[in-house]
Amino acid sequence: MALRSRSWELLPVCRNPGCRVAAFSTSAKPVVKPEADPVGNEAVAPEFTNRNPRNLELLAVARKERGWGTVWPSREFWHRLRVIRSQHHIEALVEHRNGQVVVSASTREWAIKKHLYSTKSVVACESVGRVLAQRCLEAGINFMVYQPTPWEAASDSMKRLQIGMIEGGVVLQEPRRIYE
């Protein structure tokens, strides 16, 4: 009976938004959470640690490995678009400068293949370009380098893939690096 009367006394206390009652406490006094000091939040730390590895790339300050002048394709990029054409399929990859594949799209994927009449046609290239552009934007990649060979640049399918990427919102040229 004594416990029931205490619970009725705690009910109005628990309804206050700033008060909390400890669950295993036997006292009826509410626990008040102390206010945070707003002056401490304005202080700037003397040492800054960058925990986002892509931050320098987005600011156009990160280094681009230049490689040798005689190397083709050039190694001066943060992200590069590679297109691999096999006998039956088309695959487009976005490669980071360290060699890792960040995003890819291919006509081997069932989600893309089921909408296509042919996995090698010009329309397939444009579809792969649009899907890859959407995936790049979802991953936060807005700029990349595309360096086609002269015979690739002249083909209709590669032109349509570029058009699909550009219409999707990806810029196929990276900003210049800021050296200062």
Swiss-Prot record:
GO terms for biological process: rRNA import into mitochondrion; translation. It comes from the Eukaryota. It is found in: Mitochondrion. One of its GO terms (cellular component) is mitochondrion. GO terms for molecular function: 5S rRNA binding; structural constituent of ribosome. The keyword Ribonucleoprotein applies. Signal peptide: none annotated. Gene3D superfamilies: Ribosomal protein S11. Keywords: Chaperone, Mitochondrion, Ribonucleoprotein, Ribosomal protein, RNA-binding, Transit peptide, Transport. Belongs to the universal ribosomal protein uL18 family. Component of the mitochondrial ribosome large subunit (39S) which comprises a 16S rRNA and about 50 distinct proteins. Together with thiosulfate sulfurtransferase (TST), acts as a mitochondrial import factor for the cytosolic 5S rRNA. The precursor form shows RNA chaperone activity; is able to fold the 5S rRNA into an import-competent conformation that is recognized by rhodanese (TST). Both the cytoplasmic and mitochondrial forms are able to bind to the helix IV-loop D in the gamma domain of the 5S rRNA. This is Large ribosomal subunit protein uL18m. The gene is MRPL18.
